[in-house]
Design a protein with these regions (language model features):
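All-beta strand scaffolds that present successive hydrophobic residues in beta-strands
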Residues: 70, 76-87, 102-106, 110-113, ...
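Tight coil/turn sites that cap or link beta-strands
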Residues: 73, 81-82, 101, 143, ...
């Protein structure tokens, strides 16, 4: 009997010396390390069923170190009264060993327990194959079932492991603790085994890890906490694509590690299902979660924190939903490098309702990486200095997602990033080969100058310049397409010396919103208008924005100026922002087109541009010029072809009258029309005045009734008809030439009056002009001598005077005609030679010299004081000698009036 006991005991302890096993025999490989982590496989020996049956030992066997073994296909229940189970041997034994029984197929042995203590400190003996034996606190195989509650499992010593489960075994730990002080692992699950941790705490020192292999499953649930000093949870199938995948289900629990390997790693068709989990990786190397070689990663909720990479995806499929990722390194890293060629290079990523924060790159696509389907980001937020880095071709779709940080591209592949459903990108883009698109709900807040391959925008783009660059803000290497809902927002600075947008091809639509903090300084002439090139295209720009707005302090900008935006008329590859006349304001100008020029007092503005009739607006007919304000508006272009002119204040000046367009001119009271030359054939009305300046001739031909008067400061003012001079006084310091009509205006000043043409000009004003009078032809009629001013009269026509004292000296070949019944007195030393005619009344000359040299035809009364009257006297009138002097008649006279 004793010998049989020894044999059974050795079998139960898995002693390496026992080679013959009655019911089952399976020798597993010694300790090995795979490419993706440490795989522990301690040798085990089943309890010999036949020996145990012969001895009746299907109850726990009390061995040395109080080992406990079950292999009877029967249920067993342990409780707190069970003595602590332990093993300290140097071979590969276990404190608790459970195995199924080989009958018709393997029959499971089930053990349940509560309040147990299980510990091991053994292992370390040399294995004949060159390794070291590792002891386990718990060893399960052949479909064994172990369910423990409130159990303390402890390992001490280098060559110890907490749990080994193989061959379809099942382990459940609830409200338990697993304390690992060795180097050879927390647990190893392989060949289809399954372990479930419910509200269980695992504390592992050194490099001890959790290994889930060969189609096994680990469930970490309900508040379980796994703390690994340097280890990881490594979920791996095998080394070929046909090996069955292993699974980790981590729910409402936490895992942390400070090791250089990733805290959770799935490899070779593994399945990582992480639900509301907290995963912490405190080493700058490795990742919090890593999926390799066709692994499926599902993260739902929870928090992932890493001093290295947050989520590492190697040729695998990842779905992240509702999780928060905080990483010092990359938030999410996708690569194809170092993948196993046994598996397809399938990289896929979808992110939904997640928060990804990184100190470096939030989403990183490595160089040489294959992305098989669009990366879809939905209802999520990504934030990092570089929010996206593209090292390989990728299609990224952001739906209602916030991207904060720069987008960079390090390769030359054709990638794309689309923002839709209210997505926002805040940062710069350096991606010359990437197509960026925004739908009508999305926006890009560009922080610094950016480059893209193609840009299609139906949303809102703000061109930022945090670095204060003086160069181009947005460069589109190929095609810029702005759609109907597009909003482009840009702040202009005086430092902008280059176009803010450059592109090879440009299609414009939507709205351009501009702002500026610069102070507007009004120019004195339209020759000083400035412009900025907003968009520089390599091909012709044939479209335009629907509207352009300008948010700037334009309080100093007068109403006749505006800011225009449009294709440069001289270079259709440029889209310009320029100062221009409101007269020609278009749809994309800062203010609507109008014809009002308000020039403030003390200011002058000169228009050299041609003002032509243009498209009417709701408030303007497109052809009328209105001058307002007390300042001066100067029109210098004689090609102006607009309509009416209204001068409501100040001065409207034109060197040439042709600059006034073709319509009527209205001059308000106290306003002035100042002209130098040309022909003013416009009709002039109103209470204002005309000022003729300069040395040239101004001809007025209109039927004018302006009442503010006329001032001639120099040169010649010619009116074919007196009606052209309005009704106001004429202050003449030059030459006034009038052809005919009734000149009722009062004439003053140092200038002269010239009667031109063959018609009759009648003067009726009380005139004081002193520059003399010239009659070049026709008849000049003055009812009173006072109308003829005070200087000489050079008469080559007919001068008709009614009465008064004509003290002016008369000369020339013209004649003098005395009209009316009144008395006209001549007192000048006159030498006119055209003769004198007295139609009626009395012509009085103190001296005969006043009567010129021509004959006198007298039908009235001629009174002469003295002198030699050599003129021939004729007519029915009389001659009266007046005064005390001597009058001598020498002509052959025939007058008959006595």
């Amino acid at each position: 009997m004793r010998n049989m006991y020894v044999v059974a005991s050795e079998l139960a302890r898995g002693h390496s010396k026992v080679k013959a096993q009655v019911c089952a025999s399976e020798i597993h490989s010694l300790n090995k390390k795979s490419e993706y982590g440490q795989i522990i496989k301690a040798t085990r020996a089943a309890l010999a069923c036949a020996v145990a049956a012969a001895l009746g030992f299907f109850s726990p066997l009390a061995m040395a170190d109080n080992q406990v073994s079950y292999a009877d296909a029967q249920p067993h229940v342990l409780d707190a009264s069970t003595p602590p189970m332990s093993y300290s041997g140097t071979d590969e034994g276990a404190a608790l060993y459970v195995s199924g029984v080989a009958t018709v197929g393997w029959q499971p042995t089930k053990v349940t327990g509560s309040g147990l203590v299980i510990e091991t400190s053994g292992g370390g003996a040399d294995d004949p194959d060159g390794g070291k034996y590792v002891s386990n606190a718990i060893s399960l195989d052949h479909y064994a079932i172990l369910e423990l509650t409130d159990t303390q499992i402890t390992t001490t010593g280098i060559y110890t492991q907490g749990i080994s489960a193989a061959d379809g075994s099942t382990l459940t730990l609830t409200d338990s603790t697993l304390t690992i002080d060795g180097n050879f692992g927390v647990m190893t699950l392989y060949t289809g085994s399954e372990a479930t941790l419910n509200d269980t705490t695992v504390q592992a020192a050194n490099g001890s890890s959790v290994q889930v292999q060969q189609g096994s499953t680990l469930n970490v649930l309900d508040g379980s906490k796994i703390t690994l000093a340097q280890g990881q949870i490594n979920v791996v199938a095998g080394n070929t694509a046909t090996d069955e995948g292993s699974t980790l289900n981590l729910s409402d629990s936490s895992v942390s590690s400070a090791g250089t390997m990733s805290t959770i790693q799935g490899t070779n068709k593994a399945a990582l299902n992480l639900t509301n989990a907290t995963i912490t990786h405190t080493n700058a190397s490795g990742a919090a979660v890593q999926a390799n070689n066709a692994t499926t990663l599902d993260i739902s909720g929870g928090n992932i924190t890493s001093a290295g990479t947050g989520v590492y995806i190697l040729a695998s499929d990842a779905r992240i939903d509702g999780a928060t990722i905080n990483a010092d390194g990359d938030g999410i890293f996708i690569t194809s490098k170092k993948r196993s060629t046994s598996y397809e290079d399938l990289n896929a990523l979808t992110v939904n309702k997640a928060q990804v924060n990184s100190d470096t790159i939030a989403l990183h696509v490595d160089t040489g990486t294959t992305i098989n389907a669009p990366i879809v980001l939905t209802d999520s937020t990504f934030e990092a200095p570089e929010v996206i880095k593209l090292g390989s071709k990728a299609v990224i779709q952001a739906n209602n997602t916030t991207l904060i940080g720069d987008v960079a591209q390090s390769d030359m592949s054709s990638s794309s990033l689309s923002l839709s459903q209210g997505s926002t990108l805040t940062g710069s883009v350096d991606a010359m080969f990437t197509t960026l698109s925004l739908d009508d709900t999305s926006q890009w807040n560009m922080t610094d100058p950016s480059t893209v391959g193609n840009l299609t925008n139906d949303g809102d783009i703000t061109l930022g310049n945090a670095s204060g660059s003086t160069g181009t803000l947005l460069t589109v290497d190929n095609t810029l397409t702005l759609q109907d809902n597009s909003q482009i927002n840009a702040t202009l600075d005086t430092a902008n010396s280059a176009p803010i947008i450059k592109a090879a091809n440009v299609t414009l639509d939507g709205t351009l919103n501009l702002s500026s903090t610069a102070t507007f300084v009004a120019p004195e002439t339209d020759e000083h208008f400035g412009s900025i090139t907003l968009i520089d295209s390599q091909s012709a720009i044939t479209t335009d924005f629907d509207s352009v707005t300008l948010d700037a302090d334009t309080s100093a900008m007068p109403d006749y100026l505006t800011i225009n935006a449009g294709v440069d008329a001289n270079d259709n590859t440029n889209y310009e922002l320029s100062t221009g006349l409101s007269w020609y304001a278009g749809a994309n100008s800062a203010r609507a087109a109008h014809g009002t020029f308000t020039v403030d007092a003390g200011s002058t503005f000169t228009v050299t541009s041609e003002l032509d009739e243009t498209t009417a607006t709701s408030n303007w007919n497109g052809s009328k010029l209105t001058k307002q304000g007390d300042g001066t508006l100067i029109l210098s272009n004689t090609g102006n072809d607009y309509g009416d002119t209204e001068i409501d204040g100040g001065i409207l000046a034109a060197k040439d009258a042709a600059a006034l367009g073709t319509g009527d001119v209205t001059i308000a009271e106290s306003a002035t029309l100042a002209l130098s030359q040309g022909t003013l054939d416009n009709n002039v009305t109103g209470g204002g005045q005309i000022v003729k300046s300069g040395s040239d001739e101004l001809i007025v031909t209109g039927d004018n009734n302006y009442s503010g008067g006329t001032t001639i400061t120099g040169g010649t003012l010619t009116a074919d008809h007196a009606d052209s001079l309005g009704t106001g006084a004429v202050a003449n310091s030059g030459v006034l030439q009038v052809g005919e009509g009734e000149l009722e205006n009062t004439l003053s000043g140092s200038g002269s009056l010239v009667k031109t043409g063959t018609g009759e000009l009648t003067l009726s004003g009380d005139n004081t002009y002193s520059g003399g009078t010239t009659i070049t032809g026709g008849t000049l009629t003055a009812d009173h001598a006072d109308s003829l001013g005070s200087d000489d009269i050079d008469n080559s026509g007919v001068l008709q005077v009614g009465e008064g004292d004509l003290e002016n000296t008369l000369s020339g070949s013209g004649s003098l005609v005395k009209t009316g019944t009144g008395e006209l007195t001549l007192s000048g030393g006159n030498d006119y030679s055209g003769g004198t005619t007295i139609i009626g009344g009395t012509l009085t000359a103190d001296h005969a010299d006043s009567l010129g040299t021509g004959a006198v035809a007298n039908s009235g009364v001629l009174q002469v004081g003295e002198g030699e009257l050599e003129n021939t006297l004729s007519g029915s009138g009389s001659l009266v000698k007046t005064g005390t002097g001597e009058l001598t008649l020498s002509g052959d006279n025939s007058y008959s009036g006595g």
